Amino acid sequence: MRIALLTMGSRGDVQPFVALGTGLRARGHEVVLGAPEALRPLVEQAGLEYRATPGDPDGFFTMPEVVETLRRGPAMRDLMKALPPAPEEYDQEVLDRIERAGEGVDLVVHAPLTVTTALGEPSTPWLSVNWWPNTSTWTFPAVESGQRRMGPLTPLYNRLTHWRAEREDWGWRRAEVNEFRGRRGLPPFGKSSPLRRLGHPRPHLYPFSPSVLPKPRDWPGQCHVTGYWFWDQPGWRPSPELEDFLADGEPPVLLTLGSTWPVHRQEEMVEYAVAAARGARRRLLLVGGPEGALPGDALRVPSADYSWLMPRTAAVVHHGGFGTTADAVRAGVPQVLVPVFADHPFWAARLRRMGTAARPVPLARMNREALAASVRTAVTDPAMAVRARRLGEAVAAERGVENACVLIEEWAETRTTAHTPG
């Protein structure tokens, strides 16, 4: 089969598809991966065919509207309201470019930011993926609600948060989808979102661990929690400086904020993190972050293979993005999450409830004392360390990519005609 994996966004939106694409290729399939131009080197490093999709992952988090809004709080609705409206013709060009990236294949796998194009009823069969659990359930609140507790909340409340999130999401998408459909001679959708049926007629894959979040019993049969999709960088080697730093003392505290670094008050964040690590009698290791001089008990590296680095640390402080969270969970070390937006508060609440992460310190409420207290707990709590290690062992034993490949292949075998919409 020739399969297109289409995504937009930051590295965290692309690397899981690199893992999936590598797995599919190993099983004899041809794979093309659509991603923003800035992430082309990542796709090509994995030996996958690259196709361009729109987006500037670096530019988004430097937009003044984004920085100002996220420093106030993580709510998606506030962020969407703050963004300047895009011209209608721009929205349609984005959808057209995504559609073109998926041409000439037997099957398309859509990520959250590209699935809208599937509502134009293409002739190529498609299925979908989401990094966080966006299927309605009585079991837990909607990710988009920003709810910081995983329970005890009433099932009715949980369901209402999903209804509201679905309504708001469709409110943002509806006009551009109907314009897209209209240009293809298709009737418009009404007020009810067709995306609510993801996981009913075709697979809707969730590449997180069932050890972290089991599949709710009220989800449709075609919603699948596969396990994480890991891609460990082939041939990656640490620098001599990094190896020397790690060898020169006890495991350090790791601080990595991924693509959200620009949203933070970066120098202040580093200052707080250095102090927090010292309070736990540890050194600090940064991945990314601001350039500039650091004290002797801290080191900055521009990037790293987390599968190698994280198990060599005492605790990981991170933003709670899907990919970084997965790596930290598999590493089996305690965590401190600094949620910024989207799914970050959800994973922070979940890991806190599981006892593998200390109290989260949201960006909007960041202060020296709170970060120090959480880092100290993560480094010194022996029960948390045991729980984190056991969870890491369970996740490491899962076969997320293999599970996803089998599901894709089995469903594709049943497809001999074009799909039905929605």
From Swiss-Prot:
Any single Pfam family the record assigns to this protein: Glyco_transf_28
E.C. number(s) listed in UniProt: 2.4.1.317
GO MF annotation list: hexosyltransferase activity; UDP-glycosyltransferase activity
Phenotype of the disrupted gene, per the record: Cells lacking this gene produce demycinosyl-tylosin.
CDD domains cross-referenced by the UniProt entry: GT1_Gtf-like
Keyword entries, A-Z: Antibiotic biosynthesis, Glycosyltransferase, Transferase
InterPro entries: EryCIII-like_C, Glycosyltransferase_28, GlycoTrans_28_N, UDP_glucos_trans
Gene Ontology process terms (BP): carbohydrate metabolic process; lipid glycosylation; vancomycin biosynthetic process
Reaction(s) the record says it catalyses: 5-O-beta-D-mycaminosyltylonolide + dTDP-6-deoxy-alpha-D-allose = demethyllactenocin + dTDP + H(+)
Function in brief: Involved in the biosynthesis of the macrolide antibiotic tylosin derived from the polyketide lactone tylactone. Catalyzes the transfer of 6-deoxy-alpha-D-allose from dTDP-6-deoxy-alpha-D-allose to O-mycaminosyltylonolide (OMT) to yield demethyllactenocin.
Protein name per UniProt: O-mycaminosyltylonolide 6-deoxyallosyltransferase
Species lineage: Bacteria, Bacillati, Actinomycetota, Actinomycetes, Kitasatosporales
